[in-house]
């Protein structure tokens, strides 16, 4: 990649600012999933090995008012990171000012500091989220070099990524480098055949991705709630299934443009209610009863998609095939996940979000080449958009 990576920087004796993505799920002040903290370890450990001083910061949730601060402190993250690194992580409960500056000045080579949630700066005028130039400049003044390892926020121009990078030599961390390599590789130079599998509820969320991938992929397999808008565009009866009526014409246009590249489900698991307790059965895609709704793909579609995947050299998957959180309608997602996991000769990528959670829940995570840490960021990358957080990293 043409961007600087952390290994391109001289880190010895340097104050290294690191934008990490520690936006982890919390419940009652406890971290319920530490994947994002674990994902940042290689970059942090490399900086420490090089005798740099690691100054870490991240956002956590949305913070608009003083009340929102409740439960949004990064203090529990500092404690967990300390356990994972096996060394002390100094936590500074502020985002600017003398306390933070003093703590940074006192840091020794090979030590780690984490300061408070960057979004606490959003309470007074959204300074973080609107990339306030003064804030970006101030944070940049706290370090000698900047490493951006937060792919999850790369699609946003914030003070803590773009703002700092505008004022300081910057590089991608190892996680960011990996994301650019795999997600960027799908868009720029995939090994072929490239098969994309897109699911999720709404066409509107995935229009850009479908449009872009139809120009790049050899096949695009569509599942999830958005299939019914495509079926309606073909004149099929979809009963009470989810429909975005204002997107039917658009779906029609995509179908015409796609030809046989776009593959839709041939059957559906239907029920009268959006519930795990109601009776359900499988029907062919063109005969969904008027009083029922499609909530998953059926076995014939799982078999069809499995067949379409055979021989693929690159597979990218984003979005569940049905209402994955209800066990009666999770079989499609499980089947597709398994089919991708069983491909031995392909680069297999999950574009974050619900699909990543599904693969982890099912114990298939280690069977995939890459699982993205950024749902929104990977989607925008797959749309072919330039990501501000990536673009702002110094060129080699």
Curated annotation (Swiss-Prot):
Substrate binds at residues 21-23, 36, 59-62, 119, 156. InterPro entries: Phosphoglycerate_kinase, Phosphoglycerate_kinase_CS, Phosphoglycerate_kinase_N, Phosphoglycerate_kinase_sf. One of its GO terms (biological process) is gluconeogenesis. Its EC number is 2.7.2.3. Disulfide bonds: none annotated. ATP binds at residues 206, 294, 325, 352-355. Keywords: ATP-binding, Cytoplasm, Glycolysis, Kinase, Nucleotide-binding, Transferase. Pfam families: PGK. It catalyses: (2R)-3-phosphoglycerate + ATP = (2R)-3-phospho-glyceroyl phosphate + ADP. Belongs to the phosphoglycerate kinase family. This is Phosphoglycerate kinase. The lineage of its organism: Bacteria, Bacillati, Bacillota, Bacilli, Bacillales. The gene is pgk.
């Amino acid at each position: 990649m043409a961007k600087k990576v952390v290994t391109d920087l001289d880190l010895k004796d340097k104050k290294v600012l690191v934008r990490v993505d520690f936006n982890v799920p919390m419940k009652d002040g406890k971290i319920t999933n530490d994947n994002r903290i674990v994902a940042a370890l290689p970059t942090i450990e490399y900086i420490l090995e090089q005798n740099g001083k690691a100054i870490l910061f991240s956002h956590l949730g949305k913070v608009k008012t003083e009340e929102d601060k409740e439960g949004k402190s990064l203090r529990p993250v500092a404690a967990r990171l300390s356990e994972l690194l096996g060394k002390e992580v100094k936590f500074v409960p502020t985002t600017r000012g003398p306390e933070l500056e003093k703590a940074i000045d006192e840091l020794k080579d090979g030590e780690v500091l984490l300061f408070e949630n960057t979004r606490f700066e959003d309470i007074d005028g959204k300074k973080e989220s609107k990339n306030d130039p003064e804030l970006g400049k101030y944070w940049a003044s706290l370090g000698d070099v900047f490493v951006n390892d937060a792919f999850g926020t790369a699609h946003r121009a914030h003070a803590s990524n773009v703002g700092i990078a505008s004022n300081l030599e910057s590089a991608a961390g190892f996680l960011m480098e990996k994301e650019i390599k795999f997600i960027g590789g799908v868009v720029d130079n995939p090994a072929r055949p490239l098969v994309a599998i897109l699911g999720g509820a709404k066409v509107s969320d995935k229009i850009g991705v479908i449009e872009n991938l139809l120009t790049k992929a050899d096949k695009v397999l569509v599942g999830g709630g958005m299939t019914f808008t495509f079926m309606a565009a073909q004149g099929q009866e979809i009963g009470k299934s989810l429909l975005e009526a204002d997107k039917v014409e658009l779906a029609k246009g995509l179908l015409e443009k796609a030809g046989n590249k776009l593959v839709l489900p041939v059957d559906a698991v239907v029920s009268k209610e959006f519930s795990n307790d109601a009776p359900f059965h499988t029907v062919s895609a063109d005969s969904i009863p008027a009083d029922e709704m499609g909530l998953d793909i059926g076995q014939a579609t799982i078999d069809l998609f499995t067949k379409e995947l055979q021989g693929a050299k690159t597979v990218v998957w984003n979005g569940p095939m049905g209402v994955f959180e209800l066990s009666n309608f999770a079989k499609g997602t499980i089947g597709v996940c398994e089919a991708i996991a069983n491909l031995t000769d392909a680069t297999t990528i999950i574009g974050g979000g619900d699909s990543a959670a599904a693969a982890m829940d099912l114990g298939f995570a280690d069977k995939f080449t890459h699982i993205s840490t950024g749902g929104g960021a990977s989607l925008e990358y797959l749309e072919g958009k330039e990501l501000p957080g990536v673009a702002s990293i110094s060129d080699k």
